């Protein structure tokens, strides 16, 4: 049981997991104290800090190599504002993956938040040979926004993924694994223990999905090796459990089915209401374009 208090005390806190949610909750709590709250935080998404700076709230940020030191003082009043939330890279990632896996394809996805703490997938895919560029870049309410142009490569390269990309791609790794399944060679992703703390143990489920598809994958408690097959075509039946209830596993499975073929039985489509209720409607427009 958690009971609220009207007299919050300022604290000093070390956030060492790279959790933007944890960091932001302490920042918001610090707004209501009568002192200075100090957070030493491992590098993670910084949307809250950018919004606070845009609103000219009393926040100070010192950036070091692996840590941010954030100071927040009491906030007496916040001016109201109108804010149109930009499109999210974690939703765009599914259509980026579909384009990359389709071959000889291009896509422009408009009005995406390209905050440097969010574009780990872009950095990873560029290392895998995918051509990606930002168009019409601008700053909106402190956040960098752009249209993203993606072109599928002739050959997807395998990679030994730098772990410093992890926090900026943590929600996109399932589709990154899917792309690695078609890469030439062995891809290795490390220090991914946080993936197993999501809606489902995604590192485990990512390896299961690849194995169902016929891809060799070796998984440990915090890493995965994926043995890519550029010629992969699925001709068997694959069933994804209705008890999983993970929106990203469901949507990744849809992209796999469209990209590699096979007979897929996907349950619990209601899970996509968590983040992307219009996903299947948009996917159907892709299918219709393909037919035309």
Residue ranges of model-derived segments:
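Structural preference for solvent-exposed beta-strand-turn elements
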Residues: 1-292
């Amino acid at each position: 049981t958690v009971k609220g208090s009207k007299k919050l005390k300022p604290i000093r806190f070390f956030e060492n997991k790279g959790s933007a949610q944890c960091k932001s909750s302490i920042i918001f709590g610090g707004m209501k104290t009568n002192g200075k709250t100090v957070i030493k935080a491992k590098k993670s998404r910084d949307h809250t800090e950018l919004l606070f700076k845009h609103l000219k709230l009393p926040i100070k940020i010192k950036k070091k190599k692996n840590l941010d030191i954030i100071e927040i003082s009491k906030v007496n009043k916040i001016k109201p504002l109108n804010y149109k939330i930009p499109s999210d890279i974690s939703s765009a990632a599914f259509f980026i993956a579909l384009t990359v896996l389709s071959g000889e394809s291009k896509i422009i996805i408009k009005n995406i938040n390209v905050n440097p703490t969010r574009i780990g997938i872009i950095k990873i895919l560029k290392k895998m040979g995918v051509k990606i560029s930002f168009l019409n870049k601008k700053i909106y309410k402190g956040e960098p926004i752009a249209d993203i142009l993606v072109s599928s490569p002739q050959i997807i390269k395998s990679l030994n993924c730098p772990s410093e990309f992890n926090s900026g791609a943590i929600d996109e790794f399932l589709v990154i694994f899917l792309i690695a399944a078609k890469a030439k060679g062995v891809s290795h992703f490390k220090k991914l223990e946080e993936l197993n703390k999501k809606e489902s143990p995604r590192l485990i489920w990512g390896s299961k999905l690849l194995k169902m598809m016929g891809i060799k994958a070796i998984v440990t408690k915090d890493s995965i090796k994926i043995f890519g097959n550029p010629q992969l075509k699925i001709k068997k039946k694959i069933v994804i459990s209705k008890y999983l209830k993970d929106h990203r596993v469901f949507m990744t499975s849809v992209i796999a089915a469209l990209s590699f073929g096979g007979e897929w039985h996907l349950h619990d489509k209601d899970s996509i209401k968590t983040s992307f209720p219009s996903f299947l409607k948009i996917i159907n427009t892709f299918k219709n374009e393909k037919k035309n």
